[in-house]
């Protein structure tokens, strides 16, 4: 008779403990151990990604109220955002577009104070000097060069020495009007959307990570002007989404690659890609960059986001409460967020497709999944904060967010 009573006591104790854990935290972290191609385990980098449950949604207020919460979070970098690279000739050309992102943002009482359009978006050889090294070596990647080899960084930046490396695109190639850009995320909202023709009608199209277009042209189009990534997200995407058709990164004569410098391996891979040689060291040692970027890759095909630009975007637009959590050191804006904000600082007019919206639970995680998969939240990104920002920018008329 004692045995069932003991088992019942253990069961009740376990239930009480589990309930207390669920009530205790606003977020929780654990490792996703489910099998299948949709789980992106960091096989290529010794850094685990942790799940985050959005127990409490962010308030759905006006964009003025939403952004106040974003910009008042605690300072988490070793240097304030005012200590950025003093703007050098950035390669940016004046726009004749009367209703540009810059004009609309500057006229907005909230975003007019947040946007800083003269900050360099890209980094190239002229930025590498003793002053910049001393300043950025105090900040961790991707916001600086802390822990990186000066020789590795310098040898990469010295190869970014063409005019193409100083700007995303040449404005003279789009005479007499507004340069319209589409940034295409991989969200399930695009499945069945029939937005492919509208996306391809833009002058420039940004894609990222597992950017599958074959078989989904009606919904997502096929045009690719820029492919944005970190080496880690690119290689993880090739593993995780191979079963869905992502068997190689986008390649093409006119396609440009945007490197997000999240780790030493991004600088090393970029250098090897420009030189056309195998990766000489690190986690990607022996890799042939040609298989990712094509046989005719040269310096002109590559863009490198400036660490100061990433620092500015995070402190002003996407400073998350996740930074106060146990794994706050892993936090950075998502690849999609960085591509969209890059477009907003360079293009005249921007449309966002496949990004998280308020009704994200109605859609699968990705548009190419044949069966609905729930969106998974990881502790290195704050997708709900990003969703707030996209809604706010849409309401302010600064960009167009595809919703349905």
From Swiss-Prot:
<dbReference type="GO" id="GO:0000139">
    <property type="term" value="C:Golgi membrane"/>
</dbReference>
<keyword id="KW-1015">Disulfide bond</keyword>
<dbReference type="GO" id="GO:1990743">
    <property type="term" value="P:protein sialylation"/>
</dbReference>
<feature type="binding site">
    <location>
        <position position="334"/>
    </location>
    <ligand>
        <name>CMP-N-acetyl-beta-neuraminate</name>
    </ligand>
</feature>
<dbReference type="Pfam" id="PF00777">
    <property type="entry name" value="Glyco_transf_29"/>
</dbReference>
<keyword id="KW-0325">Glycoprotein</keyword>
<keyword id="KW-0812">Transmembrane</keyword>
<keyword id="KW-0735">Signal-anchor</keyword>
<keyword id="KW-0328">Glycosyltransferase</keyword>
<feature type="glycosylation site" description="N-linked (GlcNAc...) asparagine">
    <location>
        <position position="191"/>
    </location>
</feature>
<feature type="topological domain" description="Lumenal">
    <location>
        <begin position="26"/>
        <end position="404"/>
    </location>
</feature>
<keyword id="KW-0333">Golgi apparatus</keyword>
<feature type="region of interest" description="Disordered">
    <location>
        <begin position="77"/>
        <end position="101"/>
    </location>
</feature>
<keyword id="KW-1133">Transmembrane helix</keyword>
<feature type="binding site">
    <location>
        <position position="209"/>
    </location>
    <ligand>
        <name>CMP-N-acetyl-beta-neuraminate</name>
    </ligand>
</feature>
<comment type="pathway">
    <text>Protein modification; protein glycosylation.</text>
</comment>
<dbReference type="GO" id="GO:0006493">
    <property type="term" value="P:protein O-linked glycosylation"/>
</dbReference>
<dbReference type="InterPro" id="IPR001675">
    <property type="entry name" value="Glyco_trans_29"/>
</dbReference>
<keyword id="KW-0808">Transferase</keyword>
<dbReference type="InterPro" id="IPR012163">
    <property type="entry name" value="Sialyl_trans"/>
</dbReference>
<protein>
    <recommendedName>
        <fullName>Alpha-N-acetylgalactosaminide alpha-2,6-sialyltransferase 2</fullName>
        <ecNumber>2.4.3.3</ecNumber>
    </recommendedName>
</protein>
<dbReference type="GO" id="GO:0001665">
    <property type="term" value="F:alpha-N-acetylgalactosaminide alpha-2,6-sialyltransferase activity"/>
</dbReference>
<feature type="disulfide bond">
    <location>
        <begin position="181"/>
        <end position="347"/>
    </location>
</feature>
<dbReference type="InterPro" id="IPR038578">
    <property type="entry name" value="GT29-like_sf"/>
</dbReference>
<feature type="binding site">
    <location>
        <position position="186"/>
    </location>
    <ligand>
        <name>CMP-N-acetyl-beta-neuraminate</name>
    </ligand>
</feature>
<comment type="similarity">
    <text>Belongs to the glycosyltransferase 29 family.</text>
</comment>
<feature type="transmembrane region" description="Helical; Signal-anchor for type II membrane protein">
    <location>
        <begin position="9"/>
        <end position="25"/>
    </location>
</feature>
<feature type="disulfide bond">
    <location>
        <begin position="97"/>
        <end position="178"/>
    </location>
</feature>
<comment type="function">
    <text>Catalyzes the transfer of N-acetylneuraminyl groups onto glycan chains in glycoproteins. Conjugates sialic acid with an alpha-2-6 linkage to N-acetylgalactosamine (GalNAc) glycan chains linked to serine or threonine in glycoproteins. Sialylates alphaGalNAc- and Galbeta1-&gt;3GalNAc-O-Ser/Thr epitopes also known as Tn and T antigens.</text>
</comment>
<feature type="glycosylation site" description="N-linked (GlcNAc...) asparagine">
    <location>
        <position position="161"/>
    </location>
</feature>
<feature type="topological domain" description="Cytoplasmic">
    <location>
        <begin position="1"/>
        <end position="8"/>
    </location>
</feature>
<keyword id="KW-0472">Membrane</keyword>
<feature type="binding site">
    <location>
        <position position="366"/>
    </location>
    <ligand>
        <name>CMP-N-acetyl-beta-neuraminate</name>
    </ligand>
</feature>
């Amino acid at each position: 008779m004692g045995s069932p009573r003991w088992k019942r006591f253990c069961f009740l104790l376990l239930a009480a403990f589990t309930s207390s854990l669920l009530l205790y935290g606003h977020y929780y972290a654990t490792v996703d151990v489910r099998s299948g191609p949709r789980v992106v385990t960091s096989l290529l980098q010794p850094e685990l990604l942790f799940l985050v449950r959005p127990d409490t949604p962010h308030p759905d207020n006006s964009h003025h109220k939403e952004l106040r919460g974003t910009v008042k979070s605690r300072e988490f970098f070793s240097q304030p955002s005012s200590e950025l690279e003093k703007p050098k000739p950035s390669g940016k050309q004046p726009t004749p577009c009367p209703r540009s992102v810059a004009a609309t943002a500057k006229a907005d009482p909230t975003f007019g104070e947040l946007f800083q359009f003269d900050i360099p978006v890209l980094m190239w050889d002229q930025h590498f000097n003793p002053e910049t090294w001393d300043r950025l070596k105090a900040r961790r990647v991707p916001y600086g060069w802390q822990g990186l080899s000066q020789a590795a960084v310098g040898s990469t930046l010295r190869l970014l020495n063409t005019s193409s490396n100083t700007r995303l695109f040449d404005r003279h190639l789009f005479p007499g009007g507004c340069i319209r850009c589409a940034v295409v995320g991989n969200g399930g909202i695009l499945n069945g959307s029939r937005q492919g023709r509208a996306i391809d009608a833009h002058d420039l199209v940004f894609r990222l990570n597992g950017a599958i277009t074959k078989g989904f042209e009606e919904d997502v189009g096929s045009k690719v002007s820029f492919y944005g990534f970190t080496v880690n997200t690119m290689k993880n995407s090739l593993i995780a989404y191979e079963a869905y058709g992502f068997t190689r990164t986008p390649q093409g004569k006119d396609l440009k690659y945007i490197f997000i410098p999240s780790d030493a391996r991004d600088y090393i891979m970029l250098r090897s890609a420009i030189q056309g040689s195998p990766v000489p060291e690190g986690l990607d040692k022996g890799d042939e960059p040609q298989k990712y970027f094509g046989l005719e890759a040269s310096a002109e095909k590559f863009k490198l986001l400036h660490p100061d630009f990433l620092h500015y975007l995070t402190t002003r637009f996407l400073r998350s409460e996740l930074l106060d959590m146990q794994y706050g050191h892993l936090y950075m804006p998502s690849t999609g967020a960085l591509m969209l904000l890059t477009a907003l600082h360079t293009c005249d007019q921007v449309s966002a497709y496949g990004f998280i919206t308020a009704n994200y639970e109605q859609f699968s995680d990705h548009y190419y999944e044949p069966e609905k998969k729930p969106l998974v939240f990881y502790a290195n990104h704050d997708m709900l904060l990003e969703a707030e920002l996209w809604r706010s920018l849409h309401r302010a008329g600064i960009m167009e967010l595809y919703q349905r």
